Amino acid sequence: MEQTADQPVTGQVAEAMTAEHESLSLECRADPARFERLLAPDFHEFGASGGEIGYPGTAAQVAAATDPEGEPIRVENMRGWLLADGLVMLKYTSEIQGRRANRTSLWRRTASGRWQIFHHQGTITAR
């Protein structure tokens, strides 16, 4: 069942959305250790260039590209689906320094109950 930010979001979808928003906060992105805790060991991303990025070095790359005093990442139309117990897909549009992208993330709950992202894709879109 789809849950959106315009409606009451509950349960695991709400937990995954909280984790996604954390991963997008400048404070988290500027802190490699904090950001890395949100990444699953098998994390991979298809970036805007079409290249695939894996877990090693991702947190350091994100931190190096983040200005903690910069403009926050804007998020629009976030919605989520509980695919299975402990597995959530999120879709939304982001805007970073005037660049918009459609994004999809897959989040998995660990045995300890923490949420980690294991797949992300961002596709640049026209305004």
Task: List where the protein language model places each region.
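Juxtamembrane and targeting peptides
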Residues: 1-7
